[in-house]
Every structure is written in structure tokens, then in C-alpha cells.
Amino acid sequence: MSLKILLTGSSGFLGLKLTEILSKSSNQVTGIDIKEPIKKYDNINYIKISINDYIRENKEDLNTYDLIIHTASVLPFKGKKDELYETNVDTSLNLIKEVSKLKDTFFIYVSSSGVYGKPLEIPVRTSTTFNPLDFYAETKITTEKNIENYLNINNYAIIRPRTIMGMNRKGIFQIFFTLIKYNIPIPLPNKGKQIIQFVDVADLAKLILYIGKNRIQGKWPAGASNPRPLREHLDMLGLKLDKRVLKFNINPTIFKIIGNIFISLKITSFTKWHFGAFPYDFYFDSEWKPKDFQYEFSNEETFLNSALTFFSKQ
């Protein structure tokens, strides 16, 4: 069945993958973003516009959409506090209020696994309490609560992805890959024993579309199967590259203190979540996923594919 879909944040990392997949379908798709995409796909109606302006100019047309996918967000290392709040909370709330007036539109919100901060239990389950460590996570929690307050429980889904990997993905692991390239030792809190979960951007996009097509309500994690310790991922990468990956251990508490100093001095774009949660295990309960959905890439494949793509371009 063909759907009429509105996608916010269509020029972002996840938005680009969604438009790539959707361009090969029979769905009627409109992608909105304040930036032009680095690549445009056929069969996608791109509009360079803010969400608020789009709502103002197209309020009467919103009820024609079968599915609205809200990926637009200011990331913690790309915006100031007021920008984070304006986009992640205020603008999202404006959209949510309009969606609440629609009868048959299904709404998907891409939240963040950062809402769990340093998880209070492992694996993270449906019952696990939020434990945010930074303002970004707090904005995501606020918007999740706004969705719960305004929308019918049968008409929405919330997705909380683990660390998203893929071609040209920037973040802490691109820093790791750069250190490996130049034979610089990688600081590993907890000796790299922490079990870390990733999700390939293609798998995340497929999960979103699977949930949207089947109107699967609820709150869902996004994480590849078989999470492993970070040290094992790095050792496997070294074997693939035929290169020794240099590492040195750093105490998690010292790692966090150094990180907080960097943050206070504004010499890093990372947040308290990066320094406070990274040294510890973080993965979801493997049984917590929509019925019959299968991830294509395992945790190891997700990490290696992203890493090898980085090194193949050097």
C-alpha cells in the first residue's frame, strides 16, 4: 500500500538514508529541512523550510499525510542550549499539537538512547528509568512527555536509537578512527571492557519504516544484535586493517573529570553524557523489538562497515 509521508530533517544523516530508501518505493514523500540535502533522490519532494513555517503555510494539508516521521533535531555538539530547546522542544511541540488534531495520521518520533544516560540496569528494558546526563537528553524526554500528553497512544511510536553508525557519520568513533590512522593511542576508560551497542543507519531507517507502515504503536529501542566489548571491536578492526590499534587505559572517574573540565573550558563539543556513560555497558534487551522485525547487520558488522568505509576513503 502506498503512503503519503512527511519527513522532517530530511537533509540529516538519518533523513538522507530514509529518503534514499523511500525514493525506491511507490510512496508519496515530502522531505522538509532548513538545509539543502547533500544528495537529492528521485521521487522525493524536497522543501527547504523550517518546521514552523511549513506548519503555518500547509496547516490544512497535514491531514492528508498517512505518516509523519519527525527526525529533525539539534544535536548536543552542534547547537547552544537555547537552540537545542527551541528546536527539540518548542518546534516539536508545535508539530505535536497540529498532529493531535489529525484523525488517521501515524506519528513517529526519533528520540535518543541518551535519555537513559548511564543506564541504571543492563540490559536496558521497557521498565528502565530515565537517567539523563545532559541537556540534550532532557529535551528528548520533554518531547516524549509532550507526545504522551497530546497524542492518542495508538497513533504514535517513539524510537530510541543506540549509537548510529554508517558512511560519513561523525562523532566519537570518527575520532577513534582518526587516532588509529595516525597510530595515536586511544584512551579507553574501563580498559575497553564496556559492552557497547550500535545500530546501522540503514537498519534504523528500515525499523522506522517498518513501524510506520504497520502502525506499530509504542516505544522501541534501535540496536544491532550481539553487542560486544569495545576492546573486541577495536581488536577485530586491527585484524581487518592489518594494523596494531594502540590503546591506553584510563580510570572512568578520571575520564569523567577530564571531560567535565574540557566541557567547562569549552574546548570539546562533547557533553557530560559522552564522558559519563561511555565507560560503561549500554545495550538493550534483545527481546525488546517489534514482532517479525529483523536487523540486517550485527553489532560487529555495523562497527566494521562504518570503520572500513572511513579507512577506504583515506
Go through each PLM region and give its residues:
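N-terminal Rossmann NAD(P)H-binding glycine-rich loop of SDR-like oxidoreductase domains
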Residues: 5-25
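Mid/C-terminal beta-alpha module of Rossmann-like enzyme folds, strongest
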Residues: 211-270, 299-314
